[in-house]
């Protein structure tokens, strides 16, 4: 496995699609809101003694899928992208918060699981897969009677080093139930390592990290995504304007950008942190990114913290962030943790 990825977390978090499209984004709650711990909590039910990191996420719903990179399948060798389902339940009367595996599995969960399983068959190889990011395309009619006549269409982005360096690739099932074979996004990739794509809220481009200029920095590719014809856009080989984001990058390694709303979160081992890789955030305002701010000692440690992703959660007074860390007290290697953070504006 390539040295730059040894400690990397790759998370992808997404809500069950029926919940995404059925639930309003802004609710008025007639009861007390829930609260996520502002001290990191180990997600023991997801972790193993191996390295578990790198996730991706989408919004809404109390049950959601979490895709992340793990070397559990190879007993510590190469990394694959795996998925688990997470259930968040808050009892407004008892104030009990449950975060764990789903207590009940219905047809929606089974259909989503089938879709994820089929995607992983196309994504995973004998090389290392990292940095999953999922774009949901909604439900479509299925010819498979086992899926109640529907299937979930998605585009999955990830990186893979089967050519010797990390390249960003994608699989999709926009027009057919089975996912296509993985294809490279040629306008992003170089002979260096390119990974961890994320998109701005204006649909005007995507951010990613690369060591094409030496150390890892954060880059922006100007691409028009307003039509949301993702497979066609990612298959385009036309050269794009790509620039290093000096306001976000440092002389050290800056990796794993993830954007939600006007906020970018990422990992960096720049000076001034608490040791190893720390988590930082930046706000986009008046056409530019603010100076990155360290999340502080309540989240960061002298060990490594990697690949943060945030999920908005209605009915709570803060948002839900998942990240990876090799801090002491876990199951071994890198574990996944969650922590409550200040709500990100819509």
Task: For the regions a language model picked out, list residue spans one by one.
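N-terminal hydrophobic targeting signals that begin at the initiator methionine
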Residues: 1-2, 336
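Short, conserved micro-motifs composed of acidic
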Residues: 24-346
